[in-house]
């Protein structure tokens, strides 16, 4: 009899435990439902939406690429994780003494390397702010010469044009050595400001000398569209390249208004689209020579 009572008591205890566990499970389920409902209310609340929006704006502001001066760009070039914060296609602006606000297109990121600078941006003017002849007529070359190293346009870029760049912006520019053709022979120039070559804007073949690999901006999308430019009045503009027409010493290559490659006599007035390299200000190294990275050539 006592054994049976003990068994009954044990069964009752187990039943109570099971009931309690079931009650606890129901309470947990109810709590979970309450938590889910509370979480849903929080997620749908206007306060949270405003907080998330504010946080997103703060992140975007922290990561924003400033469209300020070259000096500002150089100071902000390196991101939080050591990467270059700028991208091919970005527009950077600079106030020039002669032309006012000039917009520059990023055509290469970390392409033209420089000792002492972790990052660089290669930029080219978005529009032709002036028209110039390639070189002056002379007794030897009545229609001008297509020899870029000794050209009037190279002298203009590194003297009159360069002097119009604000000092703090000019200090960010790196002397860049670029391949060119001099009197039919392979040569190079080392300048702070320079003209792009036919090969650098994506042309090849048909007697075009290799004067540098295409910059990334000219290898994406429709290359002809990428090459098109306008002038200071918003009209379509043809502009000079530093590449000669190897079949005629009086003719230099240029990009026509439709983005194609043509040649004009060197004493013709064409648009000027300067290019240059901005070095990041993450180093105390002085402005020095940059070197085109071989990886994309």
Protein language model features and the residues they cover:
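Heptad-repeat coiled-coil amphipathic alpha-helices that mediate oligomerization/assembly
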Residues: 17, 24, 31, 35, ...
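Gram-positive cell-envelope targeting signals
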Residues: 1-5, 9, 13, 20, ...
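Generic alpha-helical hydrophobic packing signal
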Residues: 15, 20, 103-106
């Amino acid at each position: 009899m006592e054994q049976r009572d003990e068994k009954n008591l044990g069964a009752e205890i187990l039943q109570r435990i099971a009931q309690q566990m079931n009650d606890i499970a129901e309470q947990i389920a109810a709590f979970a439902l309450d938590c889910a409902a509370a979480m849903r209310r929080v997620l749908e609340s206007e306060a949270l939406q405003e907080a998330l929006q504010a946080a997103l704006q703060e992140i975007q502001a922290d990561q924003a690429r400033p469209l300020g001066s070259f000096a500002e760009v150089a100071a902000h070039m390196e991101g939080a994780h050591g990467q270059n914060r700028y991208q091919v296609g970005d527009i950077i602006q600079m106030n020039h003494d002669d032309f006012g606000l000039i917009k520059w297109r990023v055509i290469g990121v970390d392409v033209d390397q420089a000792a002492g600078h972790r990052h660089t941006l290669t930029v080219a003017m978005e529009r032709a702010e002036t028209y110039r002849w390639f070189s002056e007529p002379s007794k030897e070359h009545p229609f001008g010469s297509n020899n870029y190293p000794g050209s009037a346009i190279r002298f203009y870029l590194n003297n009159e044009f360069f002097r119009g760049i604000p000092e703090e912006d000019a200090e960010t520019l790196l002397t860049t050595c670029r391949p060119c053709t001099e009197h039919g022979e392979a040569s190079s120039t080392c300048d702070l400001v320079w003209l792009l070559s036919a090969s650098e804007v994506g042309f090849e073949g048909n007697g075009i000398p290799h004067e540098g690999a295409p910059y990334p901006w000219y290898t994406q999308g429709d290359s002809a569209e990428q090459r098109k430019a306008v002038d200071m009045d918003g009209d379509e503009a043809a502009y000079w390249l530093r590449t000669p027409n190897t079949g005629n010493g009086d003719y230099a290559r240029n990009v026509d208004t439709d983005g194609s490659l043509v040649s004009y006599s060197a004493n013709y007035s064409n648009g000027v689209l300067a290019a240059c390299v901005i070095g990041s200000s993450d180093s105390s190294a002085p402005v020095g020579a940059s070197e085109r990275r071989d990886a994309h050539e």
